[in-house]
Regions:
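Juxtamembrane helix-start motifs in multi-pass secondary transporters
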Residues: 11-12, 114, 223-229, 334
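Juxtamembrane intracellular "pre-TM" segments in multi-pass secondary transporters
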Residues: 135-164, 359-379
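Substrate-agnostic recognition of the 12-TM MFS/MFS-like secondary transporter fold
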Residues: 1-11, 15-20, 44, 48-134, ...
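Multi-pass alpha-helical transporter architecture, strongest
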Residues: 29-31, 121-133, 241-244, 331-379
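Short amphipathic helix-loop junctions that connect adjacent transmembrane helices
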Residues: 178-196, 314
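Juxtamembrane/transmembrane-helix interface segments of polytopic membrane transporters
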Residues: 30, 34, 95-103, 181, ...
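C-terminal ends and interior cores of transmembrane alpha-helices
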Residues: 15-39, 232-250
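C-terminal transmembrane helical hairpin of 12-TM major facilitator-type secondary transporters
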Residues: 225-271
Length: 379
């Protein structure tokens, strides 16, 4: 309720500054190895991560109304692709640096060094935040605690449909990357720690490709057709993980890198399309409240469902059933469940309302007409 009156930029700046305080325990815990018991170390880490994510979640409620206010609607797709590219480049180099620094057998003080590096880069990011202009809050947000009732927000049909997509997508994403790492490190054909990090970095390269792919398409074609494309790609990715965890496809480093690459492309395509659709769907009146609910629903699902998925995976530890040429174990069942969640997401995307969305056949025609292979064959 206070974001609009407090100011979008100010809310982000204060939130991002406070969250850095909780990086300090993450720096200290590895250095206390041998001085405090593992249970206390785990409690400190969980507490610090909880507070870090809580503050980040509160501050993030100002992010969407802020960028919606300063980025014109006609170029939001281009902005989001550039933002995604910057994020993927930074994440790629950070993960590569971590892989090279940690090596195969990391020791506790190395993790302290990584967290200290994160703290420094977080402080640097505040300088860039300071340079971004603020967006004026809507008059209703600035003067009233509750310009729109929560019941009216829920009854806003286009937003409610979008909220379902956000919620089910968060169910899919909750813990996914962590559980993939667990499979790659403990499953059959397990990879060394540094190779898992190198393979994980491939998803950021895949995400970077969206800069070329979506730069003009997101504004021209709309979000819905691109969301369907991303869901189809991610469905194939889940089929690959099912095959690997079920023993049908070998777990090889080059194959894993390829799957991560395609997965990164699918993630970024869907997320950017969903974000642009949210910015177009939320009305100007009470937009801080709409975006707050949107952020909270996604954050809660992303926070709760890793626990539920983890309980499911642990409960299936002893399951090993051969059927349809696959070994159905804890991971192959988990990836199959995610495939079902993707289908549910596609059903909800079908219900979403978008005024200027192209049809799927128009997307296919655009892909055939505007692709590098066609230009190369003309030469």
């Amino acid at each position: 309720d206070h974001v609009g009156r407090f100011g979008y930029k100010r809310s982000i700046t204060v939130g991002w500054t406070l969250r850095l305080v909780f990086v300090l325990p993450l720096v200290a815990v590895p250095l206390l190895d041998g001085h405090i018991n593992p249970q206390s170390q785990l409690a400190l880490i969980i507490g610090a991560l909880f507070c870090f994510n809580l503050i980040r979640g509160i501050a993030s409620t100002a992010w969407f109304p802020w960028i919606t206010g300063i980025i014109p609607e006609r170029v939001r797709g281009r902005y989001l692709t550039r933002e995604s590219a910057a994020n993927n480049i930074g994440s790629f180099f950070a993960l590569m640096l971590a892989a090279m620094y940690l090596g195969k057998d990391a020791v506790p003080h190395q993790f302290a060094g990584l967290f200290a590096f994160s703290l420094v880069t977080g402080l640097v990011s505040l300088w860039f935040i300071h340079r971004v202009p603020d967006a004026p809050a809507a008059e209703e947000d600035a003067q009233s605690k509750q310009p729109v009732k929560w019941s009216e927000i829920i009854r806003h049909q286009p937003f409610r449909k979008l909220l379902w997509v956000c919620f089910i997508w968060a169910i899919f994403m909750g813990g996914l990357l962590g559980f993939i790492v667990k499979f790659l490190k403990t499953g059959e054909g397990a990879l060394a720690d540094d190779r898992v990090l190198y393979a994980s970095a491939a998803k950021f390269v895949g995400g970077l490709i969206t800069l070329w792919f979506l730069y003009s398409r997101l504004d021209r074609l709309g979000s819905r057709p691109l969301m369907f494309l991303a869901l189809g790609i991610l469905g194939l990715v889940m089929a690959m993980w099912i095959g690997m965890s079920g023993g049908k496809i070998p777990v090889r480093f080059d194959w894993v890198c390829g799957v991560y690459f395609v997965m990164g492309f699918g993630f970024c395509t869907f997320y950017m399309s969903l974000t642009k659709l949210a910015m177009a769907t939320v009305p100007e009146l009470g937009k801080s409240h709409f975006f707050a609910l949107y952020s909270v629903v996604g954050s809660l699902a992303v926070g709760i469902f890793p626990i539920l998925w983890g309980i499911l995976i642990d409960s299936l530890t002893s399951v090993k059933v051969n059927w349809l040429g696959l070994e159905w174990n804890q991971f192959s069942i988990y990836f199959t469940a995610l495939l079902v969640v993707l289908v549910a997401t596609a059903v909800q995307v079908l219900r979403v309302e978008e005024k200027k969305a192209a049809r799927l056949n128009e997307l296919v025609f655009d892909l055939l007409r505007n692709n590098p292979l066609r230009e190369w064959m003309r030469r």
